[in-house]
Amino acid sequence: FKKQNMKKKSLSAKKIIHKSLLNHLKNKKINKVYNYFKKYLDENCDKKTRFGVAISGGPDSLSLAFLTKCYAIKNRIEANFFIVDHRLRKNSTKEARSVKILLNKYDVNCKVLVWHGQKPKSNIQGIARNHRYNLLKKICKKKNISHLLIGHHIDDLYENFFIRLLRGSGLKGLSSFGEPIKEENNLIILRPLIKCKKEDLIYISKKVFNFFIKDPSNEDSFFLRSRIRKLIIDLNKQGFDNKKLDLTIRNLKFANDGIDYYVKKNITNNSRFIEDKKTFIINKYFFKQTQEVVFRSISIILRKISGRYYQPRGKSISDLILKINSIKNKKITLGGCFIEKINETVFISEEK
């Protein structure tokens, strides 16, 4: 009887929490963001989707936690929330715990994933990002989660555009950030806030939780992203505003979609995937397409074989294609893949 009574009290407390969360949707500003979020998920998921949600403690991810929880309550579906503790800063474990405790009060139960092992001294953000996605992918596979939600917003989209431009990215890299990505094991990575402004997400975090963590690296000019952020502010002052940037990205996307058609055709017609050996066999016609089609085709294959969220840098892929075209028999490793050319045939498998 006591157990039943406690269960009833627990359910009653949950209902009160859920009602309080949903009441925030009456706020016009919050409701506008939620409606965009809902539309995005409705278009990319079905009603039985199992969500994983990546949380950090910043305003973007806390807003994502709130919006996903509201969506889960309304649609009676399950959402799993994950915090990654990179242990790169002294206070990271304490911060992860405080975010977990805070969200638990709102019936958002988080699991903390810890990155163990040696920490990098260079390319810190890039290496941390790869480890973060690997941890998230593993837990999603373990829990049979089909969709992982990430809190990237439109400011991230602009920053990534310039970062990729500086690194010499091609059309694909400049226009594809923010699109759904299908990983191995059929995990789909979604960015449902990609058209939302950071200032709106800060507003939601303050209104709902009255809390968010400021990442000191965001203001540190040691990191490229921080310098890019300042560059965008300067460009806005010079007249290259966000509307013009949106138009540029949209035009690049139209051109990109046309090339994608030929990339899919190239992979289908000129390569074969042997699933049990996790190996691609590529014929000589694969490399006789236009440069951009070959580049993208090989990039897709490298990502599929390695299972890594991010592919190798563009220069490394271009160098690989050059070596394949210039040497008959060659063995190369790149991005977690083993590439071997025998006569006119190329084999790409997982690096052991």
Put a short name on every predicted segment.
Residues 1-60, 78-82, 86, 115-120, ...:
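AMP-forming adenylation/ATP pyrophosphatase catalytic core
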Residues 7-231:
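Core alpha/beta nucleotide-donor-binding catalytic domains of modification enzymes
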Residues 215-219, 242-245, 310-311:
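Short, surface-exposed loop/turn segments at secondary-structure junctions
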